């Protein structure tokens, strides 16, 4: 069940990367991008902890942050 949920969440993020994101100018201040960070964290830590980490990362990604290199721990 966990693997199915991980696959579903990653597929949703990849859909966003391929179908939605190209229609907007790049705005992520981090490397890897927030969507790539989300995929990596979900695969590494599972659907709940990984999605929570991704959400916190997205909340940090704003005009007031420096950004830069911030890999999944």
Curated annotation (Swiss-Prot):
InterPro entries: Membr_insert_effic_factor_YidD. Keywords: Cell inner membrane, Cell membrane, Membrane. SMART domains: Haemolytic. The keyword Membrane applies. It is a peripheral membrane protein. It comes from the Bacteria. The keyword Membrane applies. One of its GO terms (cellular component) is plasma membrane. It is found in: Cell inner membrane. Transmembrane segments: none annotated. Belongs to the UPF0161 family. Could be involved in insertion of integral membrane proteins into the membrane. This is Putative membrane protein insertion efficiency factor.
């Amino acid at each position: 069940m966990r693997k199915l949920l991980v696959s579903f969440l990653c597929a949703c993020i990849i859909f966003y990367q391929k179908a939605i994101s190209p229609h907007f100018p790049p705005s992520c201040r981090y490397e890897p991008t927030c969507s790539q960070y989300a995929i990596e964290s979900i695969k590494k830590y599972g659907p709940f902890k990984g999605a929570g980490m991704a959400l916190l990362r997205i909340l940090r990604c704003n005009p007031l942050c420096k950004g830069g290199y911030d890999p999944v721990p």
